[in-house]
Amino acid sequence: MSETTDKQLTEAEKRKLLRERRLAKMAQGKASDRLNTILSQGSSVKSVSPPAVTSVLENKATKSTDTATVTDSSTNATSVSPSAAKATPTSTGVSSAISDFDDPEIQDISDVAVNNSGVLALGNLSGLDSNNPSQPNLDEMFQKIMQQQSQHNCDNDNNGENNPMAEMLKMFNSMGGGDNNGGLGGFDSMFSGSPNSPPPESISPEMMKYQADLAKYHTYQEQLWQFRFLVVRILATIFNFAYHFITIPSFTASNHAYVRDLSEVYPLLGFMTIFTSIEVVIIATYYLLFTKLGLFHASNQKSFILKGISTLSMFVPQLLRYEPLVATFLGYKELLGIFVGDLSLVVVMFGLLSFSN
């Protein structure tokens, strides 16, 4: 037991002596030479000499000398700081050696961090909301889907193919109502594929908002002009009725034959003649004005008949050829409705007059 302890102490002493001897040798200024010799022995290319390096031991000695110089400032006024001594190498070889063998500088994390703006930009391209990147922007995704579908629809139209999906989207647009054709403004031009409509890529959210506002404006114009014509029709009918009621005695409606025979004495047919003439002028003006403003077929597109044709056309495409005829018939039905409405007003006034008598 004691022999083993003595042996360990002896080895420790040997290592301590060897270390002290090595430090003494290095303190004589031979540390850098030995380090350069070791580096030169490991070089595979003999023609190129390795750069001269400085040992760490000599750097420590230099630092200790500089520290002692700064402390003894009263005896040596021109002291050099350790940072200046380290920052000013004595030769180009030492500078290159430090840059080659020292640890690299710590890289700033901001240089390698993910740029949020780039992620948000990619998110916008993929349909993500910039305010909340984790949630998709449904409006932009829906717009891109419709643009792709409209482009596919244009290609199929050029090839003479029928696209059921395009017909379905067209039906939804017609059910929504809005612009001159009763659609949703820009959506109709997107899916129509007409040469006058802008390409799907050029339709921006601002353009879509403009088309929606334009559809609302057309609806307002249609309702405004219908109200104006309604006021004119009512006033014209009441004025015609009041004129004949004042100028013609016994101006009334009756089931008795002797009352109807009064037309031989009094020109009772003049009322219907004037009424019919006024109705012709009003209907003609209504048709010309609404056609000029592009509002004549706007309300017809909201009819359930056209919506039913659009729905059935997805299964029977041949029904689309009859859609313009049905739209024209509905337009003339509106004109006929004006005459029937005014005639109903006349019947009501005659009924009130007969009830009062």
Swiss-Prot record:
Role noted for this protein: Required for the post-translational delivery of tail-anchored (TA) proteins to the endoplasmic reticulum. Together with GET1, acts as a membrane receptor for soluble GET3, which recognizes and selectively binds the transmembrane domain of TA proteins in the cytosol. The GET complex cooperates with the HDEL receptor ERD2 to mediate the ATP-dependent retrieval of resident ER proteins that contain a C-terminal H-D-E-L retention signal from the Golgi to the ER.
What protein name applies here?
A: Golgi to ER traffic protein 2
Species of origin: Lodderomyces elongisporus (strain ATCC 11503 / CBS 2605 / JCM 1781 / NBRC 1676 / NRRL YB-4239)
Say where the protein is mainly found.
endoplasmic reticulum
Which stretches are tagged as biased composition: Polar residues? 88-98
Which protein family is named in the record? Belongs to the GET2 family.
PANTHER family, from UniProt? GOLGI TO ER TRAFFIC PROTEIN 2 (PTHR28263:SF1)
Looking at the UniProt entry, the stretches that span the membrane are 225-245, 271-290, 335-355
**Keyword annotations of the record:** Endoplasmic reticulum, ER-Golgi transport, Golgi apparatus, Membrane, Transmembrane, Transmembrane helix, Transport
Gene of this entry = GET2
